[in-house]
Amino acid sequence: MTNTEQKRVLLIDSLNLYLRAYIMDPSLTMQGEPCGGIKGSLKILQKLVRDSNPDEIIFIWDGPNGSQKRKSLNKDYKSGRKPIRLNRSVKNLTDEEEMQNKVWQQMRLMEYLNEMPIMQIIIPEVEADDVISYLTQTPKYRGWQKVIV
């Protein structure tokens, strides 16, 4: 099989992609609610598809309590991360409203992705990077080019 015939799978650490878009894109709905997580994620996806021309796209989300196993092995796991600083010129939501909006945008993004030819994977207590590592080793994707984001 030549490189031009080689199939390509796009494996996306979805929460990472979504949070980057959420933090950086200050877009608002007509009602003034932040929507940059959705808009930015879809724009990033559009660019990734255009640039990599994948045969399959898989969004892998961190499962609920995904970090707990690693945190139990290493109490400092992810402890050195800086707090999120949003790219917003106007703070129109309380911290609680901001958290609700962040979750709402993520759920809406997942709904939108369900309408596309995209597989989404969420496994309780497993982080996305572990699932991505597993998928790269599965027989289905043997011989495929893997694009990991």
Show where each model-derived region lies.
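Noncatalytic, basic helical substrate-engagement surface that gates or grips nucleic-acid strands
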Residues: 2-148
